[in-house]
Amino acid sequence: MKTYIQLLLVALFLPLLSACDQEDDVIDIFTGKTWYMTYIAVEGQNKMYDFWQNDQDAREKSFKTITGDNYTLVFEGANVNDVAIGTFSGKATSTSVNGDWSANGDNRELKITIKNGGGTDGDKYLGKAFMDGLKSAFKYGGDNKNLYIYYKEGQTVKFISFAPQRNSGN
């Protein structure tokens, strides 16, 4: 009976000992996959922002650029002193970019420093927004199945939504 009670106490307290850490596993979120853009929206919304201001032809032309390795990001890095740091590379439509990144799992702060590329993209709507978003990124959200990079455009906070590209490791 005494052994039964001891086992019961261990079973009851085991979840407390292995409680989930609220800090993100930032390396698991960012690395090991190619992220492709799924949409760009205003924070709190989940529909594509209307960069085209109801110009359906321009919208359709932009959406045709969402193919192949366009609008993709690849992060490499390691965890150093509880902050993930590393390098990244990406591509809009005609513009490639690479540089350094760091992310803090405690407060979800994201810093992206572009070292090469990042100029004007061939698509003046989605391509421009993609590059602007990387340049002014300040936080992230998501997990290893969805990544949201938040950026400010004036007083408006927008985010770029990403999903892992098929056959990219996840």
At which residue positions do the language-model features occur?
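Sec-dependent signal peptide recognition
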Residues: 2-10
